[in-house]
């Protein structure tokens, strides 16, 4: 079994309701892997979360100083790097909060959650502690309605890591959505234990990270124009990916294009439930490639 596939299996075992705990160290075996995870068998890796916010500088400070991300650049692109994900920001005066759209929030995991909370308290960053599980809670970004779920895992090899993206389709759509992300992007369907309270959640795994699917309150709004405007996948070859999804009946909204002054290619599509998705090739800076 390849190193990448072993790491994926390790994460699945760790999160699955019937599995035993499993070390995450395999996924951190090289410095390069502390950024985007290795691509799956379809050449796809989780790439980024793109946020539309009124005050870009305040959110930049929130995701770096408060949450522990690292500011990096790829030509004209500014990214905030966490192991397994990039966060990107764009200025928008009137983006609605994520609540009520397909993507409600995304989650980070901390090696020492109490130390992180002490840092947030000292800096005046708003956060809460879970009523059922005090190891879990949310941290709230300034004035955008964005909340980041956080929890602690002392076995984490580094101080912080990406964990999940939480989508809230109508309950009747959960299985179809899970199957769609597996078919189009190569997610590995399964379940994980809830963190906030007892129970299980349907997921698609992307390496050791996951897309979590929970029932929303009816049909959710599309993400485009919300504070969590879209999510991103990074692929090894965007042109080949376009051909593969076209055979599945999935089309980009426009042909792939190269971002000026970079080697990064991008294209966009929307899933059947209103999630706006950017697909990139070579998003990571050379110093932060997987």
Language-model-detected regions and their locations in the chain:
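Amphipathic alpha-helical segments
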Residues: 54-70, 116-123, 172-189, 247-248
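Short, surface-exposed ligand-recognition loops at beta-strand->loop->(often short) alpha-helix junctions
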Residues: 50-55, 108-111, 167-174, 234-236
């Amino acid at each position: 079994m390849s190193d990448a596939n072993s790491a994926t299996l390790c994460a699945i075992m760790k999160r699955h309701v019937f599995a035993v705990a499993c070390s995450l160290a395999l996924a951190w075996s090289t410095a390069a892997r502390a950024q985007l995870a290795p691509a799956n068998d379809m050449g796809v890796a989780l790439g980024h979360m793109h946020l539309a916010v009124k005050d870009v500088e305040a959110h930049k400070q929130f995701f770096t100083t408060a949450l522990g991300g690292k500011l990096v650049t790829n030509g004209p692109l500014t990214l905030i790097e966490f192991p397994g994900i990039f966060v990107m920001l764009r200025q928008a005066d009137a983006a609605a909060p994520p609540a009520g759209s397909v993507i409600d929030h995304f989650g980070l995991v901390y090696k020492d959650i109490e130390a992180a909370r002490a840092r947030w308290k000292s800096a005046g960053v708003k956060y809460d502690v879970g009523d059922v599980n005090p190891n879990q809670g949310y941290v709230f970004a300034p004035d955008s309605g964005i909340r980041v779920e956080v929890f602690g895992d002392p076995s984490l090899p580094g101080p912080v890591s990406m964990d999940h993206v939480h989508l809230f389709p109508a309950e009747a759509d959960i299985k179809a959505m899970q199957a769609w992300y597996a078919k189009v992007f190569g997610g590995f369907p399964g379940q994980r234990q809830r963190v906030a309270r007892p129970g299980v959640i349907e997921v698609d795994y992307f390496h050791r990270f996951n897309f979590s699917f929970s029932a929303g309150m009816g049909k959710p709004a599309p993400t485009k124009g919300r504070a969590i405007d879209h999510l991103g996948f990074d692929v090894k070859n965007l042109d080949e990916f376009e051909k593969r999804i076209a055979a599945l009946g999935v089309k980009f909204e426009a042909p792939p294009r190269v971002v000026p002054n970079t080697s990064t290619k991008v294209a966009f599509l929307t899933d059947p439930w209103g999630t706006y998705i950017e697909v990139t090739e070579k998003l990571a800076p050379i110093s932060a490639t997987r």
